[in-house]
């Protein structure tokens, strides 16, 4: 019985891990599906304007759009500036 319990409990843990991973993937996909069509171009243009004035790598800038309510959107811009 102990051997059977071992395998059954492992399947539950594996199933829970798989379920959690799937939930994360679905949440990420929903996050990007809610972005407006103009958002990728907006990111590129913001990055190009910043690069005009500050010499930085593109990975040092993150742009994120969060939806708080149906009528409120928040555009978050994080820039790691060089010394």
Curated annotation (Swiss-Prot):
UniProt record, GO biological process: cell division; regulation of division septum assembly
Keyword Cell cycle attributed: yes
Protein keywords: Cell cycle, Cell division
Annotated InterPro entries: MinE (IPR005527), MinE_sf (IPR036707)
A Pfam family recorded for this sequence: MinE
Keyword Cell cycle assigned: yes
UniProt family annotation: Belongs to the MinE family.
Function description: Prevents the cell division inhibition by proteins MinC and MinD at internal division sites while permitting inhibition at polar sites. This ensures cell division at the proper site by restricting the formation of a division septum at the midpoint of the long axis of the cell.
Protein name as catalogued: Cell division topological specificity factor
Name of the gene this protein is made from: minE
